[in-house]
């Protein structure tokens, strides 16, 4: 598993799952096995979630404007 070094307000890309397409997700809190936050795109836009870290495909943007697209 990748150590993403995620922080609050980072935006990640979550993989497609079942009927849910790949989408952007804003991180609020980071735990050992999941993140919390809100979907920014897709059918669940604005909805709170707690996706597992294994669902992260890549980092879309960093809250501090650094290293975009790298995990």
Residue ranges and their predicted role:
Residues 10-13, 26-28, 36, 54-58:
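Ser/Thr- (and often Asn-) enriched beta-sheet segments in non-cytosolic proteins
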Residues 39-71:
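Intrinsically disordered, low-complexity, charged/polar segments
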Residues 3-18:
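Short coil-to-beta transition motif at edge beta-strands of beta-rich domains
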Residues 1-5, 26-29:
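Short linear motifs in intrinsically disordered
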Residues 17-49:
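Basic/aromatic-rich interaction segments and small domains that mediate binding to polyanionic partners
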């Amino acid at each position: 598993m990748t150590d993403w070094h995620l922080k609050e307000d980072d935006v990640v890309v979550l993989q497609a799952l079942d009927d849910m397409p790949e989408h952007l997700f804003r991180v609020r809190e980071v735990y050992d096995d999941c993140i919390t936050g809100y979907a920014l795109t897709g059918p669940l836009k604005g909805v709170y979630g707690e996706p597992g870290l294994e669902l992260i495909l890549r980092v879309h943007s960093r809250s501090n404007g650094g290293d975009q697209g790298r995990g």
